[in-house]
């Protein structure tokens, strides 16, 4: 990114603190976001790893992940996930942002931490509701709720993986998601 700054116009920005604050906010969000859109880094996971019966297919086209399947609680199951293992070296990220649309259902963002011995039963989560129109979501790490036993502390440099999940009840999954990033 190249930024040309005309010093003669700097005075205008200093006289308009709201403009300056807005520009700094936009610049900081774009400069420090960690994009997580590489389809090669994501994988589908279902409760079949523990004997469940849920099914999931993942497709990626034109920068959009498509999750389609069925969550069923049969045989003590009940989840499908689009999951990405990550390795962050600093603690500067405050949350996850993405755009999603789907079949007017509730989905969850799951964060699993390093050092947790019992995934997928121990994680942090936040629910979000989708509609048939694209919506932008920003979920702060501070707003995540602990599920299960959590020995590790929530810091962005302590994240093991991030998942978008259909969870906990019988329903059809039909979700499109894009522009996934840490902010």
Region locations from a protein language model:
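N-terminal secretory signal peptides that target proteins for export/translocation
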Residues: 1-18
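Sec-dependent signal peptide recognition
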Residues: 17-25
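Hydrophobic h-region of N-terminal signal peptides that target proteins for export
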Residues: 24-33
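Beta-rich carbohydrate-recognition modules and glycan-binding surfaces
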Residues: 32-183
